[in-house]
């Protein structure tokens, strides 16, 4: 369980890419200002099994480009397995607004009502020299692929994600978003 606690400690909190954003702006590159807020939410999940060792986390991602802000919330479960840390995605609970879902707005929900995402391939992370690294590739449909690759340390969160439709990228950037703890 030490690995789980170490991973959770690195990936939870409030992060932004202000330094990277300012550098990109100075270089004349179009790049989003991004915030990432990860909060453990087991306290809002009723009737967890007695021997439950995982940590549910609300991930709030906010992207701003050309003055337009977009929220992208998710619910994940962090579990420790023999191969490392596994991160399956769960559907935003029924009755919650998928566009504005956050830890603060989250209502208590029964564990039995949570639904694992069928589309997202659980991300697998490995630790090496104090840095957790991993991700997954998910087929959201026969033509839509989502790729996620992340690195976590005490100092930063590096996130590369892209969406491809028929092999053409429709979302994502050439360089990973580098978040620092706020």
Predicted regions and their residues:
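N-terminal helix-cap/turn-to-beta initiation motif at the start of protein domains
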Residues: 1-14
């Amino acid at each position: 369980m030490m690995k789980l606690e170490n991973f959770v400690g690195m990936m939870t909190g409030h992060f932004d890419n202000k330094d990277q954003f300012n550098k990109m702006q100075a270089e004349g590159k179009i790049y989003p200002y991004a915030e990432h807020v990860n909060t453990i939410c087991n306290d809002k999940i009723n009737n967890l099994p007695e021997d439950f060792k995982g940590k549910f986390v609300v991930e709030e991602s906010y992207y701003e480009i050309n003055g337009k802000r977009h929220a992208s919330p998710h619910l994940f479960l962090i579990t420790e397995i023999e191969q490392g840390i596994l991160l399956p995605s769960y559907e935003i609970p029924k009755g919650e607004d998928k566009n504005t879902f956050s830890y603060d707005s989250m209502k208590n929900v029964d564990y039995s009502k949570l639904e694992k995402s069928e589309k997202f391939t659980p991300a697998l992370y490995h630790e090496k020299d104090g840095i957790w690294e991993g991700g997954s590739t998910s087929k959201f449909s026969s033509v839509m692929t989502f790729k996620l690759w992340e690195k976590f340390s005490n100092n930063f969160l590096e996130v590369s994600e892209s969406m491809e439709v028929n092999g053409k990228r429709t979302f994502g950037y050439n360089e990973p978003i580098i978040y620092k703890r706020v």
